Amino acid sequence: MPARETERMMKLQDVILKAMAKKLKRGPHRRRRPRRPMPGMLLHIDGSKHRWFQDDRYYDLLVILDDATSRIYYAQLVAEESTRTVMTALREVIEREGLFCALYSDRTSHFFVTPKAGEPVDKSRLTQVGRALKELGVQMIPAYSPQARGRSERSFGTWQSRLPQELRLAGIATVEQANRFLRERYIAEFNHKFTVKAAERGTAFRRCGRSDLGWIFSIQTERVVAKDNTVAIRDQWWQLDKTRWRHTLAGQTVTIHQHLDDTVSIRYGPHVVGRGKDGAVENQNQVSPRSLEIASGDSHFSTASTTNPLSPKPKAKRVA
C-alpha cells in the first residue's frame, strides 16, 4: 500500500476512534419518558419568557398541559410567573376539569424549597403552592433538568414559533387582548391540532367538591396578636376591636390569608375575624392604610361596633 494511502487510512481511523470515544463519554441516549396512559394522571406546569408581541416587551406564558394527551388546560400571559399566577392557573383548572393526581414542574422557589443549588428539594418544607396542593391531595414532582421537562419544552417551541405571528395577524398588542384571544380561540385551535389520543380510555380527573378553594389558594402567614390586640400585616398594624365573645385575642395566633383577588382575611381557628383590601400582596413597598371589616356572617365573634372595627395603627416594629 502506498505511503500516502496508508497515512490517509490512519487519519480516518483516528477520526473514527475519536468519534466513538466522544459518544461513549456522553453515555446512553436519553429515552423519552412514556406518557401517562390516562388524562388527569400527570399535569405539567411551566412558564416561558419570550417577546410575544412585535416589540421588546417580555412576558411569561404560563401553560398547564396533560402528560397523556398534550392537551392544554391553561395558557395565559403574565408579567412574571409567581406564586399568585401559578395559584390562579391551578385553581382555574381544578374548578373546570377537577382534581388531578400529580403536578410536574421545575424547582423554582414558588414550587419547591431547595436548600442548596444542585441538591434535591426539601419535601418537608412546603411552599405556598405545595401547601395548597397537599391540602387537595395532589402530588408534586420536581424536574431536575430541562430534558426531564421535555414535553412542556417541546410545546413551548411550538408556542414561540406560532403565537407571535397569530397575535400579529389578529392585530393584538396588549396582554389583555392576547389572553382573551387565547381563551376564546387559540387554545381550542392548538388542542385540535396537537392533542394526541390517550393510551387508555377514561379519565383520572375527579370532581372537586371543595367549596373553600378561595381559602386554600391564598397566601397564608401566621401572626401573634400583640398585647394591645393588634396584628401586623406588611408594614401596617391593624387594631382588632373587642368582641362580646372574647375581650381580646392578645397572645393568640391568627392566620392572615392574602387572597388572589387582593382581599385579606384574618382567621382565628375556623372563625373569620377580619376582612379588608390589600393591593400589595406580593409588593415589598409600604402598604397604604386600609380598613378591615369584621365579617359577622363568618364568625360567632359579634362585634361591639360595625364602623371600621379594624383600623391601622402606625408603629415602628412588628409582632415577633
Each model region followed by its residue ranges:
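Mobile-element integrase/transposase regions
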Residues: G27-I72, A79-A89, E95-F100, R131-E135, ...
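C-terminal, beta-rich DNA-binding module of retroviral/retroelements integrases
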Residues: R185-R318
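Charged alpha-helix within mobile-element recombinases
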Residues: D122, Q128-E200, A204-W215, T255, ...
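Double-stranded DNA-binding cores of transcription factors and transposases
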Residues: M1-R26
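Residue-level detection of beta-strand-connecting loop/turn positions
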Residues: D55-D56, R107, D235, P270
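Acidic/histidine-rich, metal-coordinating catalytic segments
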Residues: L90, I94-D122, A143-P146
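Mobile genetic element proteins and their domesticated derivatives, centered on retroelements
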Residues: V15, D46, I64, S70, ...
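Basic, flexible linker segments flanking DNA-binding modules
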Residues: A21, G27-I45, H50-R51, P115-P120, ...
